Design a protein with these regions (language model features):
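Core of compact, soluble alpha-helical bundle domains
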Residues: 1-100
């Protein structure tokens, strides 16, 4: 049985690239979480798109280029409160609603 991954069903890497573009449009408007990101979002966009693609069954480019995600370690410097969590979720909801 050949299972199709979510990565394949949504159209591959292009979907995740577009999703992340919309996500960061919303992040730019979230005063609480915007300071958690670098001024230039280019690298953040690249890594998030590759991470999400890999997580949902795409190629392991993220891990090959960056190693284990170590999410807890990467986010440790930030105070992620319930309000910050909700701001992140709003940004991702916006992205999901707007991605083609």
């Amino acid at each position: 049985m050949n299972e199709t991954t979510l990565f394949d069903r949504v159209g591959g890497q292009a979907f995740f690239d577009d999703l992340v573009e919309f996500f960061y449009v919303a992040v730019e408007q979230e005063e609480l979480i915007r300071p958690m990101y670098p001024e230039d979002l280019t690298e953040s966009k690249k890594w998030l798109a590759l991470f999400l693609a890999q997580y949902y069954g795409g190629p392991s480019v993220y891990q090959e280029e960056r190693g284990h995600p170590r999410l807890r370690m990467r986010h440790a410097p930030f105070r992620i409160t319930k309000k910050a969590r909700d701001a992140w979720l709003r940004a991702m909801h916006f992205a999901l609603e707007n991605v083609a």
